[in-house]
Design a protein with these regions (language model features):
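Bacterial N-terminal signal peptides
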Residues: 11-20
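N-terminal module-boundary/linker segments of secreted carbohydrate-active enzymes
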Residues: 25-66, 70
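Aromatic-lined carbohydrate-binding/catalytic grooves of carbohydrate-active enzymes
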Residues: 72, 76-175
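Glycan-recognition surfaces
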Residues: 150-153, 197-295
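C-terminal beta-strand-rich structural cap/linker in extracellular carbohydrate-active enzymes
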Residues: 387-408
Length: 408
């Protein structure tokens, strides 16, 4: 019996049970945009814009418990994060307890004495959605019970708990085939009848952008992010290094299926506020999931201003769903462009250097006629700059950005 047949049989059984680089100048050409996807042709019709929310790992690692998660949920509501669009609260690794005699997974009774269902109910009562973490191996990255061999059983449990989002990792998987392993969990989640977003976290090792769109809603394209500007640090990558690896994958992204350059580090203290604005702007330009990773209960005003910049969030959440790309680079200066619904363009001027730099985006780079008049809005200054022809530019701070919305 083939793996595909096994999955089909398992789905039927479960349904019965549940019954109840340096680049040259390049213009944006509308003919090169990736085709729009009908939700019915994607994995499950969910995540038609990039998911937004919070994940526990970047800030708390394994030091997570229900008291912390409830405090985060309360802070997301009171701070305005929920109103800004951040709706998922995802509990990452180390929530697990043991499996019972029947193999059913439970929560760590010390960390989550009230149980996961009660926690999910609390988040839902606050108008938020609940996400959880598991792994395609026998054990998670943190050494807790993984889902290998328990995919349908765990999916049933997650659905009964009220889970809305599953981050599915790739530690301790041995010789498993990644596409088959993720397809198995995808089938299990769909068979429950509950809408659960599937986040594929296999670090880009097996080219998930080639197959993830028919299985999940987002897929990690790189190893883990770290709160550094650039370079590799142990097994993790700095912000700019991840942006460079994620950028060429733009043709694979679209509504319901997103490239995921990993969670945000904004507010965790390793970068300057200028660098965090660059980080956030790049993620928005790349139509990346905006999953905050800071301590929600201890946000300073600068962090709030970055994460809740409604103009920049709107670029990320644009309904056209096109991932932006770099169209010009010269030394440390770059121009990125993202087509938006209604014919507008988001433009990001990036200065990777150590000194201020003058950078301009030309209408040719944007795929617009040179003499066309267009209104320009500065998305970080929240200021309309009037109508321009031919180009829009700025003097950009070291490691900084200028970001515009250009509407013909």
């Amino acid at each position: 019996m083939t793996m595909k047949t096994l999955r089909r049989v398992a789905m039927i059984v479960l349904a019965l049970l549940l019954c109840a680089p340096a680049i040259a100048q390049e213009a944006i050409d509308q003919n090169t945009l990736p085709p729009s996807r009908d939700p019915a042709r994607t994995a499950n019709g969910l995540a038609q814009t990039p998911p937004m929310g919070w994940n526990s790992w970047n800030r708390f690692n394994c030091k997570i418990d229900e008291k912390t998660v409830r405090a985060v949920a309360d802070a997301m509501v009171s701070s305005g994060m929920k109103a800004a669009g951040y709706t998922y609260v995802v509990v990452d690794d180390c929530w697990h307890g043991a499996r019972d005699k029947d193999g059913v997974i439970g929560a760590d009774p010390t960390r989550f004495p009230g149980g996961i269902r009660a926690l999910a109910d609390y988040l839902h009562s606050r108008g938020l959605k609940f996400g959880i973490y598991s792994d395609a191996g026998r054990k998670t990255c943190g050494g807790r019970p993984g889902s290998q061999g328990h995919e349908y059983q765990d999916a049933i449990t997650y659905a009964r708990w009220g889970v809305d989002y599953l981050k599915y990792d790739w530690c301790n998987t041995g010789t498993r085939n990644a596409e088959e392993a993720y397809a198995l969990m995808s089938d299990a989640l769909r068979a429950t009848g509950r809408d659960i977003v599937l986040s594929i976290c296999e670090w880009g090792n097996n080219r998930p952008w080639d197959w993830g769109g028919k299985i999940g809603n987002l897929w990690r394209t790189t190893g883990d992010i770290t709160d550094k500007w650039v370079g590799k640090h142990h097994y993790s990558w700095g912000v700019m290094s991840i942006a460079d690896m994620n950028e060429p994958l733009w043709p694979h992204a679209g509504p319901g299926h997103w490239n995921d350059p990993d969670m945000l580090e904004v507010g965790n203290g390793g970068l300057t506020d200028t660098e965090y604005r660059t980080h956030f702007s790049l993620w928005a330009m790349m139509a990346a999931p905006l999953i905050a990773g800071n301590d929600m209960a201890a946000m300073d005003e600068a962090t709030r201003a970055i994460l809740m910049n409604h103009d920049v969030v709107a670029v990320d959440q644009d309904r056209l769903g096109v991932q932006g790309r770099r169209v010009w680079k010269e030394g440390d200066r770059e121009v990125w462009v993202k087509p938006l619904a209604g014919g507008a363009r988001a433009v990001l001027l990036v200065n990777r250097g150590e000194a201020p730099a003058a950078i301009a985006a030309t209408w040719d780079q944007l795929g617009l006629p040179d003499r066309l008049g267009a209104s320009v809005r500065d998305l970080w200054a929240h200021r309309d700059l009037g109508r321009r022809r031919g180009s829009a530019g700025a003097t950009v701070a070291p490691h900084g950005v200028a970001m515009f919305r250009i509407q013909p």
